A protein has these predicted regions:
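Extended glycan-interaction surfaces of carbohydrate-active proteins
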Residues: 427-468, 490-509, 557-598, 641-733, ...
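Extracellular glycan-targeting catalytic surfaces
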Residues: 372-373, 383-385, 395, 462-467, ...
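Structural helix-adjacent loops and short alpha-helical linkers that scaffold large soluble proteins
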Residues: 427-433, 467-469, 483-496, 527-544, ...
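C-terminal capping/lid segments that line or modulate ligand- or cofactor-binding pockets
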Residues: 1-36, 519-530, 535-539, 646-657, ...
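Terminal accessory carbohydrate-recognition/targeting modules of carbohydrate-active enzymes
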Residues: 1-432, 789-790, 808-895
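Alpha-helical scaffold segments in carbohydrate-active enzymes
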Residues: 442, 497, 542-556, 612-615, ...
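Aromatic-rich carbohydrate-recognition surfaces in CAZymes
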Residues: 469-476, 480-587, 599-607, 678, ...
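Active-site-proximal structural scaffolding
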Residues: 94-96, 267, 350, 354, ...
Length: 895
């Protein structure tokens, strides 16, 4: 990542463990260290869970400014809203944040509460491998190779997943936490019969060492074998053997300044490091598992109105401070990296007799010690709250010694930081969606973690939910588009995270999970919202690298392996579409026919990506590229219609192939039913790749309440299909993500009424669920219209915020995929938009939402035009396809 990247703040909600605030430790950036402050309010002698970010834990995101100078969450102590705590973090200065906790007692009884503040220095793993070598020895990680190759090529050889260098994997038992070998999942390409590195004759790795003055040098190699037998290699003509070892072991090979290890195919192996050392000192190389330096020196001063605790760490430049504002402060310690190892009733009792937090109350249970680590626990005990009142506590969290302030001064910091954090100002018709969309907005913004490793550095990453500690290609595009509703800068940050320039030989975009290339629609939406297109031009060549991979033209891509215009990403992940249990996909895996099967969604998405790149190229004057995009679009559009259409069902189908790559038909059930009746089967309409009667049939399927248009929205699977069931993950559920693609497509087709129906049903269902539970779920059951799976999910549910803004938030301009805007100039009661139309549908719709306080008149290139006012202030313009663009002007009607 280069210096022109947008920077994230060093303080933020970055913990992967417990909700609170974290500080990134810059001096330990190579280790990925962060400092966590976690806050746990609880009723005395209760079972309120600690704020574990990976499981339901009673807290709900409530508010967040897009610069992270203020955010808050609600902690339920007695459901629902009987007793709760509103916890916020307010930036005081560059080195300090104020934690404010207001506990509300809405019961008729007095309450006794406790406030726990936990502080911990966190690393990706609590232990690491310390390597010591003799003075003058040369130590090199195995990943510092000149070249690394497999005799049998992997489809991902030049598109390595998870931001890794080729062959690299993460493992705390290895030096620097990284090893070299083959740990990429490959069960989805079982037909390639891939073997671990070293188990295939001809696997190679090359190294080069600088000149040195070591008298009798040899090379110590730390390794482990991953199959039975000894691993045997040719080393520049000499045979070297690495004896079988299930544990990491050291072998010694002859010294050569440059050499290649070429496998004889005897056993699989993983390498850790190489060390050039004098033979007489080889036994002085040691590898020890050491605890990370997470233990602090603790100094506490008792003040008139609280405690100040100083936590000093050997490897951190400056100490951390916790300053409370209540004389009823105590402190405890937990010798564990897992707060759940502490008994919940000990955490909720502030008496000193309960300070042995892991001590059980019965010999029937053992002490728990799940992880190594250490938490310092400042607690404010015996917070008495009268009925129907609230109580506020302030705690300053700092890396410079804070001064104790008055409650009034603390409150002023809070109020100042909170400015500008108000929810979106919807028009009256949309006000009922305020709470549910604000919770989702806050979830999207705070689902951000550190560290995630990306090609040599640890980065801050916006994740679908904090239970996923990794990149996610298709989720990230939706995260970025959700962030765009509040912060174009954060959208750009998320997008640029996933793109690469041509200096990266290990991958041309970040790949993890289903390869649904949502970065293209993310780029399009960001460009349309950005009037200065040149400021984002640097992303074009990066996006083009990505696109060329999707066409099978760079980085050894196999996406175009059928050589007929149909495209598949099944060589890169078991799911091409993100719909894990989509029936055709499940059946393909059961048949083990991935090699001979091609879905439709990948081709459709890549056609749409080509159309987007064509629009961007036109804007930037990259006219030579347009011809390439046009040829690609025509080639794949024809292939879909010639090879994948099933007239009998009126859906497109998974094409199946023989050994020679010839299409033999489409995938069917034993009874002859098209196995692709569902989202994949209608996806060519998203690409604009189907016309006439075929398009009509697809629209009928999507709109039919007995097929795809369920009571909860658009079903992933046709409900009349023999393979539909109502309790799957995607099968039987409605997700917002692919439904968003259909919604945009309805705008492309001038289907404004149905587009609104999609958005309105989703918003109402989301409101009912989130207003009731305060949770933001992944999907909604068709049978129940209730949310399910992960509870603090952002990612693929981001379209909820997009729909709410599109129809109810003034100054929001929305189009389908086929409309490009050169600029969007808006106020609450006016708009001036220059646009171009690139599609070929009979009609298309644009939505411009302005204030509901006035009446409007509209002009296209100076000529007055009609529009539909969907809701007061939400104006829909449906144009004939012959309208290729112009300047749309909307003004207050003075008549």
């Amino acid at each position: 990542m280069t210096d022109n990247k947008i920077k994230m703040p060093v303080w933020g909600p970055y913990s992967k463990k417990y909700m609170g605030i974290s500080k990134i430790i810059n001096e330990l950036a190579d280790k990925g260290a962060r400092y966590d402050f976690s806050v746990h309010p609880t009723l005395w002698n209760s079972s309120t869970p600690v704020p574990n970010v990976t499981v339901p834990s009673n807290y709900h995101l409530w508010n967040c400014k897009n610069d992270y100078t203020f955010y808050s969450y609600r902690y339920e102590l007695m459901w629902k809203d009987e007793v709760y705590a509103d916890i916020s973090f307010s930036k005081a200065d560059d080195d300090a944040y104020l934690m404010r906790c207001e506990i509300f007692n809405n019961t008729s009884l007095s309450q006794n509460c406790i406030l726990n503040i936990f502080a911990s220095l966190e690393f990706p793993h609590p232990t690491y491998c310390e390597v010591s070598v003799p003075s003058g020895a040369i130590l090199k990680t195995a990943n510092d190779y000149v070249d690394y190759s497999y005799a049998v090529a992997r489809p991902w050889d030049e598109e390595n997943p998870d931001g890794m260098f080729k062959g690299m994997f993460a493992d705390k038992e290895f030096y620097l936490g990284k090893g070299l070998g083959d740990r990429c999942e490959n069960y989805h390409v079982h037909f390639l019969n891939l073997k671990p590195f070293g188990f295939e004759s001809g696997d190679k790795v090359s190294y080069k060492f600088d000149d040195n003055d070591i008298k009798n040098p040899i090379i110590a190699v730390r390794y482990k074998t991953v199959t039975d037998g000894d691993a045997e290699f040719d080393m520049n003509g000499k045979t070297v053997v690495f004896a079988h070892s299930d544990e990491l072991n050291i072998a010694y090979i002859p010294y050569m300044s440059e050499f290649t290890l070429e496998s004889h195919g005897k056993a699989g192996i993983e390498f850790d490091f190489l060390c050039v050392v004098d033979e007489s000192e080889k036994e002085n190389i040691t590898c020890k598992t050491k605890a990370q330096p997470y233990m602090p020196q603790i100094e506490t001063k008792v003040l008139e109105n609280g405690h100040i605790t100083k936590l000093t760490y050997d490897t951190v430049d400056k100490p951390f401070y916790i300053l409370t504002n209540n004389k009823n402060t105590r402190e405890r310690k937990l010798d564990s990296g897992c707060l759940e190892d502490a008994l919940i009733n000990r955490l909720s009792n502030g008496d000193h007799t309960y300070d042995e937090l892991r001590e059980t109350f019965s010999a029937s249970f053992q002490r728990k010690h799940s992880d190594d680590g250490f938490f310092h626990n400042s607690l404010i005990k015996s917070i008495f709250i009268e009925p129907n009142t609230s109580h506020v506590e302030y705690v300053m969290l700092s890396q410079s010694e804070p001064k104790q302030l008055s409650s009034e001064e603390y409150e002023a910091i809070y109020q100042n930081a909170k400015k500008g954090s108000k929810p979106a100002s919807f028009n009256k018709a949309g006000e009922k969606y305020t709470l549910s969309t604000e919770i989702l907005k806050s979830t999207l913004l705070t689902n951000v973690v550190y560290p995630v490793y990306r090609h040599g550095e640890n980065v801050i990453h916006h994740t679908p939910g904090k239970r996923w500690d990794s990149f996610y290609t298709w989720d990230s595009g939706f995260i970025g588009m959700g962030l765009l509703e509040f912060s174009p800068k954060l959208c750009q940050y998320a997008l640029d995270m996933y793109l690469c320039d041509d200096t990266n030989k290990d991958f041309c975009f970040l790949l993890h999970g289903s390869l649904v290339p949502t970065q293209f629609v993310e780029y399009l939406e960001l460009l349309k919202r950005t009037n200065d297109k040149e400021s984002l031009a640097f992303l074009y060549d990066k996006a083009k690298l990505y696109y060329e991979f999707l066409r099978g033209r760079n980085h050894a891509s196999t996406v175009a392996k059928f050589n007929n215009g149909l495209l598949t990403t099944y060589d890169y992940w078991y799911s091409h579409c993100g719909m894990d249990d989509y029936p055709a996909q499940v059946e393909m895996m059961a048949r083990k026919s991935q090699k001979y099967t091609c879905p439709c969604l990948s081709t459709a998405q890549i056609i749409r990506a080509g159309k987007i790149m064509k629009m961007v190229a036109d804007s930037l004057g990259r006219y030579d590229d347009i011809k390439i995009y046009d040829e690609d679009i025509e080639y794949s559009t024809k292939a879909l219609n010639d090879l994948a259409w099933d007239e009998e069902s009126g859906y497109f189908g998974y094409t199946e192939y023989d050994e020679n790559g010839n299409v033999t038909g489409i995938m069917r059930t034993a009874d002859g039913e098209n196995f692709n009746k569902g989202m994949d089967g209608v996806y060519p309409i998203v690409a604009g790749a189907v016309e006439g009667e075929r398009k009509k049939k697809l629209l009928e399927h999507i709109k039919n309440p007995n097929e795809m248009w369920s009571a909860a929205g658009i079903s992933a699977v046709d409900m009349s299909a023999s393979y539909y069931f109502d309790d799957g993950y995607w099968n039987g559920n409605v997700w917002m993500s692919h439904q968003w693609f259909i919604w945009k497509t309805m705008l492309d087709n001038g289907e404004a009424d149905f587009a609104y129906d999609i958005a309105k049903l989703a918003l109402d269902m989301w409101k009912d669920e989130t207003d009731f539970t305060y949770n933001t779920y992944e999907c909604f059951g068709i049978a129940t219209k209730r949310g399910g799976w992960f509870h603090n999910f952002g990612g693929l549910s981001a379209p909820i915020c997009i729909w709410a803004n599109a129809y109810f938030k003034p100054q929001t301009v929305t189009t389908g995929f086929d409309v490009w805007t050169d600029y969007q100039k808006t106020t609450d009661n006016s708009a001036n938009i220059k646009f171009k139309y690139f599609g070929n549908c009979d009609k298309y719709t644009m939505i411009i939402t302005l204030s509901d306080k006035v009446k409007y008149v509209a002009y296209l290139d100076g000529q007055k035009i009609d529009f539909n006012e969907r809701n007061k202030g939400s104006l829909e313009f449906t144009f004939d396809k012959n309208v290729k663009g112009g300047v749309l002007e909307i003004k207050e009607d003075q008549e």
